[in-house]
């Protein structure tokens, strides 16, 4: 949605795709615009054909269909492209959820057909179906099983962390995962905190994305193994230690006191340094999780890691 509007997916295509455009040689996953169906509820209309948006930039009308969303992601040069879906708000009546999920499944079939028609598998591009179902475990499981019949290369679990309590969120992830193939990647969209990620890995999740590391960095919050710290707090004004002693990376060269000074002076470098640190923290956490799984002690390791993180006395 956002890249389609600005700078435009045609511009990105002319620049050689996202990898060349931003000089990134790693994998790139793009969403379809389905989350904007949820987040821009006041600016869109949903029909069977697709979704009509009023641009948040200038109010211009924008129509995205299952077919066009695959074409947009082809132009972007994504490695993993998501199907168009409807992210359901919380709470929502069961009958409305059923109707929405049925449409999401029809859209998924149309996306899969267009994915094949465009020849994206031959280019090594993957497409993931997205499980929806609101807070209803039975609907989520049926949705997952129906998507599995479409035989996508991978599957996402969407519509979680949209206002529901954490225990319910974890139930939704578990119900969704129970209907998905064991030999395909499972991607939980839009989450979460370090403890949430570790709990969802135990439920069968493989991949995650979240704005949290950079969004909280903009508010001077750094993640550490002992919990998050808020560098706006005065107690860090003369703290010569790094953000934490384990994460490492470029940001570890600087003291908490210096980064707090940047925060208080409204220097953009503060956000950059904390963002780099937070992303590295999450990458390290996932690396340690993989190692624990390979060693066969994930349950013990994750319990100890969560306990340490949540027992922190740091000010949030």
Residue ranges of model-derived segments:
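C-terminal extensions of enzymes
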Residues: 85-92, 244-316
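Generic secondary-structure signature for well-ordered alpha-helical cores
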Residues: 78, 109, 113-116, 178-181, ...
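Non-catalytic, usually N-terminal nucleic-acid engagement modules in DNA/RNA processing proteins
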Residues: 1-121, 229, 234-237, 264
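Short secondary-structure capping/turn micro-motifs that flank functional sites
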Residues: 4-5, 89-90, 163-164, 216-217, ...
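Conserved, mostly hydrophobic/aromatic
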Residues: 31, 73, 129, 147, ...
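Glycine-rich phosphate/ribose-binding loops and adjacent secondary-structure elements
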Residues: 105, 114, 118, 122-243
């Amino acid at each position: 949605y956002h890249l389609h509007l600005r700078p435009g997916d045609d511009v990105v295509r002319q620049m050689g795709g996202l990898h060349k455009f931003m000089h990134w040689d790693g994998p790139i996953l793009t969403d379809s615009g389905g989350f904007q169906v949820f987040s821009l509820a006041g600016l869109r209309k949903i029909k069977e054909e697709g979704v009509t948006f009023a641009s948040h930039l200038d109010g211009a009308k924008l129509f995205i269909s299952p077919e066009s969303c695959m074409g947009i992601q082809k132009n972007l040069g994504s490695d993993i492209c998501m199907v168009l879906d409807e992210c359901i708000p919380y709470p929502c009546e069961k009958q409305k959820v059923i109707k929405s999920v049925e449409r999401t499944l029809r859209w998924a079939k149309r996306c899969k057909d267009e994915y094949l028609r465009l020849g994206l598998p031959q280019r090594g591009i993957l497409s993931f179906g997205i499980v929806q179902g609101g807070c209803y475990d039975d609907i989520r499981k049926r949705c997952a099983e129906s998507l599995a019949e479409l035989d996508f290369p991978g599957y996402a679990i969407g519509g979680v962390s949209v206002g529901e309590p954490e225990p319910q969120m974890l139930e939704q992830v578990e119900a969704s995962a129970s209907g998905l193939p064991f030999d395909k990647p499972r991607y939980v969209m839009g989450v979460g905190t370090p403890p949430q990620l570790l709990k969802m890995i135990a439920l069968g999740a493989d991949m995650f994305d979240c704005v949290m590391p950079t969004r909280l960095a903009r508010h001077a919050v750094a993640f550490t193994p002992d919990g998050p710290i808020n560098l706006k707090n005065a107690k860090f004004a003369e703290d010569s230690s790094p953000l934490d002693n384990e994460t490492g990376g470029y940001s570890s060269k600087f003291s908490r006191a210096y980064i707090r000074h940047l925060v208080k002076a409204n220097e953009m470098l503060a956000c950059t340094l904390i963002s780099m640190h937070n992303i590295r923290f999450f990458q390290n956490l996932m690396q340690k999780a993989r190692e624990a799984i390979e060693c066969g002690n994930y349950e013990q390791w994750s319990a100890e890691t969560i306990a340490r993180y949540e027992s922190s006395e740091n000010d949030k």
